């Protein structure tokens, strides 16, 4: 039994679930009484993977952000995939905030993952392949140990495990 097993560590955003969460947030934004006359809006640019939030003041903008975060959490999407920009003034005394969506594991976090795997001193190998990290080894038990350890790591990107072979 000399076969090796492997899995990929990726950071992907489920766009269908994100779209559902966004639609729920827009619906709640229209129905919330405390946000009635704030001209609050949520716009999503799919090409740039960027949300643009606009509201009358910073307090109502914070409420819009809270609505989006709560809907994402309810849909099982990690809010670590959001990269918040600065709150900037917009037209007619309103404020605007841009939020970028992060996908993929950057080189710095991939290095952290591979170093953490090497520090475990298990018989597994970690290799960076673009925006994902492949972990391979001869024992399924060791791979599961690595998986649970990676889940407990506090990284700024959400991790998913795919291609389990």
UniProtKB/Swiss-Prot annotation:
Cellular component aspect of the GO annotation: cytosol
Pfam family, one: DUF520
UniProt KW Acetylation keyword: no
MF (Gene Ontology): nucleotide binding
Transmembrane segments: none
Keyword Oxidoreductase: no
Domain of life: Bacteria
UniProt keyword list: Nucleotide-binding
Family: Belongs to the YajQ family.
Function: Nucleotide-binding protein.
PANTHER family documented for this protein: UPF0234 PROTEIN YAJQ
Name of the molecule in the record: Nucleotide-binding protein Ctha_0558
Organism of provenance: Chloroherpeton thalassium (strain ATCC 35110 / GB-78)
